[in-house]
């Protein structure tokens, strides 16, 4: 036997290298085979409910890192709730209707307008479901736990029926109406868009300054006067029916030198406009208040059949332009509102594809709207005063990335204005984890217009509306519920398969259809109405969930999307918000803080991370960032997170190895019998348990990460485990001192594994498989550790906090001695302490082997004053010299008692007593040489 064999060197097969990319799928298959998700739900039956309702990602393509961050965050919350006494099922979902899928099929060569619609919709459905399957595997590979076999999908008959019923309730309350208001119109999608489908980009446009000649000055202006107008959308002049001025803005009538014409502009802008137009020696003839110009009539710049009326509008400013805007009610919300108030014609001169129509005039007909500027300039002639290119923020279709226009077309609307205050009142009752989120949603609802819910597309849920022979729209409870039942039984494709009369209840009649003839609506619903109905299609309809849901968690873009549409439909139906809490996240940016895009080549696919590092590293990364704001991710950042993971793993490996001979049922030492330092570590760890439990409850992942890493690095590695080897390796295997420390090791190991489970389930299960004395076969079926209360815990914490200060001072003294070449390692030191009464009392209270805690071979508490050479602090001073004696071959301490023993071992008296007591046979035979 060799002397080293008398040491209790920790033994474990738990590998240092995690091998996550290959091991994770093995664990995941084991969980699936064991029906772990279902077992967890059964275990929690009857406990308080917690419903995190999954916002449905769009079923198109593999998931990106933003999806991963979102789903991992949800998984951490649901797992922590499940381990904290809550029944917390998780039903993942997918959003499956809409334009992107139509675009994919178009790229694949499918021609929608050349094939049977029902066949086309079947292709859309098949593609959508294939993407659901693809993303389901992506999410499962992240280790996300949920009811993957029974997700919700917005194209299933039960969901579509629930959506129709949401619409029906809104129709019954009078919240649905048809109107021809201007809406966001995407010529690239050939459809109306909701606000949530708009994103803003910078666009360079040609802006024109031109003049309308006064036709009837109403006794205020002469007919040789021209009103100067500014526009950034020249194509809309073809539909201009008025000029809007600000009632309280001052306008001036001016005549530049050498110019026969007189012009009207805003007084505040005269100087800048004179420079722009090249006007010199401008004479101000008169000043008018805007309201004095009301109802003056001007000529259209080129269309002699059209008169343009001067009207008043609150939206006119003097921030730019001329203080006067032309008004085309068919092409803008403000224009429409003031136009209707003044009985202006709502002219629309652009078709659904962005092509100028016949009513725009023969010179314009057939041109794309963006290309008409040269024709407009030609038509304006000498009425054009200036033109310039401007860059401004402009709305784009978020899917096609093409600019959109405002365009008045008959659409179906949900009247938010009828119940706006109810919605705002409900927002006040919701808990927002970011106060700015509440303000943002509140302001959006307060300021938004009515919701255009109709779309001129094919792949979506039909609007359940019929038309009588006289054109009356029919949407009554009887017909809508009948359609809902048909959808529930056959799916929404039946709308396209059957004639209108076969979609109505048997025997249905209407006074507007004396001949019994009916037509059906061909528009479909906005996809935000699809996902915005999920509270009904899922949360209400699934018995395991509770409505309103406890939490909605999505990206911050969903304040204008899913948070918004869900809130509107839920309040419209039931008068309550669909969620009790909202937690929003920022976007995942690259390592430099730039937005990720394929064109820049700076994207990170979750699958690439899984192959290089493993999903655990992505999961740990999610907790390492403040996801309430935009976050950064790169392979370098993940590499740093991987180092943190390695530190966590190796620390826990040390605990596993050094409790391998510990049976908790037989070897646990009662708390009251622990050494002071072990009690301290137990209490410190209990503080960590509380911090982490509280942070899980508040969804504060970064707090968990920081607290965990700090505990492992500072409390364990830099202190407790630093001197632990002097105990667990050196002392007798069954000695009280070793069992005391193992008791703490094992307690921390078991509990920290449970605390880590929501974040690192793969690693936690791997550790758990080495804990043979724990009863649950999976750690995921256990509960998070409870926070305990210990006698005198505050006093113990105060004592050891003071000791840590003392230890820091001692380490400075040792460092100085090391720099002066007095010692090499700290074990070579004899440390003499010159304490005042406070420190002396402290060291007595610590009641421990202080030399062992400081990892020095000898420590002396001296009486009297410290020598001049000592390193002095306020309460204590230190001197350091080399310890007397020889190095013990077993414990490596320098000890005066170290000597060669009769059994061929050069060891100190302390080690000799351990060896002689525990290894009598080896002592009798003598040890082998080193």
Curated annotation (Swiss-Prot):
The residues that hold ATP are: 598
Q: Residue ranges for motif 'HIGH' region?
A: 57-67
Gene Ontology biological process: isoleucyl-tRNA aminoacylation
Gene3D superfamilies (UniProt xref) = 1.10.730.20, HUPs (3.40.50.620), Ile-tRNA synthetase CP2 domain-like (1.10.10.830), Valyl/Leucyl/Isoleucyl-tRNA synthetase, editing domain (3.90.740.10)
Q: Known EC number(s)?
A: 6.1.1.5
The record's principal subcellular location, in a coarse class, is cytoplasm
How is the co-factor bound, per the entry? Binds 1 zinc ion per subunit.
Note on domains (UniProt): IleRS has two distinct active sites: one for aminoacylation and one for editing. The misactivated valine is translocated from the active site to the editing site, which sterically excludes the correctly activated isoleucine. The single editing site contains two valyl binding pockets, one specific for each substrate (Val-AMP or Val-tRNA(Ile)).
Task: List the protein's name.
Answer: Isoleucine--tRNA ligase
Which species is this record about?
Streptococcus pneumoniae (strain JJA)
**Originating gene:** ileS
């Amino acid at each position: 036997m060799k002397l080293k064999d008398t040491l209790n060197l920790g033994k474990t097969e738990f590998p240092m290298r995690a091998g996550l990319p290959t091991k994770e799928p093995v664990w995941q298959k084991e969980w699936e085979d064991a029906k772990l998700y279902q077992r967890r739900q059964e275990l929690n039956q009857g406990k308080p409910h917690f419903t995190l309702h999954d916002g449905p990602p769009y079923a198109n393509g593999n998931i990106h890192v933003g999806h991963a961050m979102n789903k991992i965050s949800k998984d951490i919350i649901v797992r922590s709730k499940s381990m904290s006494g809550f029944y917390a099922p998780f039903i993942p979902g997918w959003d499956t209707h809409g334009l992107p899928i139509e675009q994919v099929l178009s790229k694949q060569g499918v021609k929608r307008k050349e094939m049977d619609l029902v066949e086309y919709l079947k292709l859309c459905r098949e593609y959508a479901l294939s993407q659901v399957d693809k993303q389901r595997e992506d999410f499962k590979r992240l280790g996300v736990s949920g009811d993957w076999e029974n997700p919700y999908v917005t194209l299933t008959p039960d969901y579509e029926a629930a959506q129709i019923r949401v619409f029906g309730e809104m129709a019954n309350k009078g919240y649905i109406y048809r109107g021809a208001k201007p809406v966001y119109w995407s010529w690239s999608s050939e459809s109306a868009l909701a606000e949530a489908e708009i994103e803003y980009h910078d666009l360079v446009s040609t802006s024109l300054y031109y003049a309308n000649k006064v036709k009837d000055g109403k006794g205020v202006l002469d007919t040789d006067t021209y009103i100067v107008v500014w526009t950034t959308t020249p194509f809309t002049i073809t539909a201009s029916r008025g000029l809007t001025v600000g009632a309280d803005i001052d306008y001036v009538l001016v005549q530049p030198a050498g110019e026969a014409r007189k012009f009207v502009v805003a007084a505040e802008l005269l100087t800048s406009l004179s420079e722009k137009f090249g006007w010199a020696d401008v004479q101000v003839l008169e000043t008018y208040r805007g309201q004095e110009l009301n109802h003056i009539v001007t000529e259209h710049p080129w269309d002699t059949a059209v008169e343009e009326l001067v009207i008043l509008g609150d939206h006119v400013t003097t921030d730019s332009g001329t203080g006067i805007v032309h008004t085309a009610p068919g092409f803008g919300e403000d224009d429409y509102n003031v136009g209707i108030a003044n009985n202006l014609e709502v002219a629309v001169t652009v078709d659904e594809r962005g092509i100028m129509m016949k009513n725009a005039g023969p010179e314009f007909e057939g041109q794309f709207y963006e290309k008409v500027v040269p024709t407009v300039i030609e038509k304006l002639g000498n009425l054009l005063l200036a033109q310039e290119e401007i860059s401004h923020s402009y709305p784009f279709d978020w899917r096609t990335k093409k600019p959109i226009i405002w365009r008045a077309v008959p659409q179906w609307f949900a009247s938010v204005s009828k119940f706006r205050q109810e919605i705002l009142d409900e927002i006040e009752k919701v808990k927002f984890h970011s106060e700015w989120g509440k303000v943002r949603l509140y302001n959006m609802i307060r300021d938004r217009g009515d919701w255009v819910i109709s779309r001129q597309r094919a792949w979506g849920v039909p609007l359940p509306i019929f038309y009588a022979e006289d054109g009356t729209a029919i949407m009554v409870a009887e017909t809508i519920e009948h359609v809902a039942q048909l959808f529930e039984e056959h799916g929404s494709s039946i709308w396209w398969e059957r004639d209108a009369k076969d979609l109505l209840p048997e025997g249905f009649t209407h006074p507007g259809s004396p001949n019994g003839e009916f037509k059906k609506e061909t528009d479909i619903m906005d996809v935000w109405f699809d996902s915005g109905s999920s509270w009904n299609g899922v949360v209400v309809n699934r018995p395991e969930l509770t409505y309103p849901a406890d939490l909605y968690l999505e990206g911050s873009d969903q304040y204008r999307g899913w948070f918004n549409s869900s809130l509107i439909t839920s309040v419209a139906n039931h008068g309550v918000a669909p969620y009790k809490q909202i937690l929003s996240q920022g976007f995942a940016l690259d390592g430099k803080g730039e937005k990720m895009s394929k064109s820049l080549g700076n994207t990170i696919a979750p699958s690439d991370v899984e192959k290089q590092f493993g999903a655990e590293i992505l999961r740990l990364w999610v907790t390492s960032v403040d996801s309430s704001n935009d976050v950064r991710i790169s392979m370098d950042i993940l590499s740093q997170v991987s180092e943190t993971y390695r530190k966590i793993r190796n620390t826990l490996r040390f605990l596993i190895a050094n409790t391998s001979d510990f049976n908790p049922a037989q070897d646990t030492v009662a708390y009251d019998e622990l050494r002071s330092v072990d009690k301290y570590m137990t209490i410190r760890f209990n503080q960590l348990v509380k911090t982490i439990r509280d942070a899980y409850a508040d969804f504060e992942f970064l707090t968990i990460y920081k607290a965990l890493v700090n505990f492992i690095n500072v409390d364990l590695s830099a202190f407790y485990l630093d001197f632990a080897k002097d105990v667990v390796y050196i002392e007798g295997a069954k000695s009280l001192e070793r069992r005391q420390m193992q008791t703490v090791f094992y307690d921390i190991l078991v509990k920290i594994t449970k605390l880590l489970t929501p974040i690192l389930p793969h690693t936690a299960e791997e550790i758990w498989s080495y804990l043979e004395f724990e009863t649950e076969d999976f750690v995921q079926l256990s509960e998070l550790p409870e926070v305990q209360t210990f006698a005198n815990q505050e006093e113990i914490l105060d004592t050891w906090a003071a000791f840590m200060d003392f230890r820091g001072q001692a380490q400075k003294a040792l460092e100085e001695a090391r720099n002066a070449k007095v010692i090499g390692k700290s074990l070579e030191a004899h440390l003499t302490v010159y304490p005042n009464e406070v420190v002396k009392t402290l060291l007595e209270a610590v009641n421990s082997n202080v030399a062992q805690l400081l990892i020095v071979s000898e420590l002396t508490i001296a009486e009297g004053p410290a020598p001049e050479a000592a390193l002095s602090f306020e309460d204590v001073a230190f001197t350091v010299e080399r310890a007397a004696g020889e190095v013990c071959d077993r414990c490596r301490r320098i000890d005066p008692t170290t000597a060669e023993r009769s059994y061929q071992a050069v060891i100190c008296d302390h080690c000799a007593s351990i060896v002689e007591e525990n290894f009598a046979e080896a002592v009798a035979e003598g040890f082998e040489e080193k």
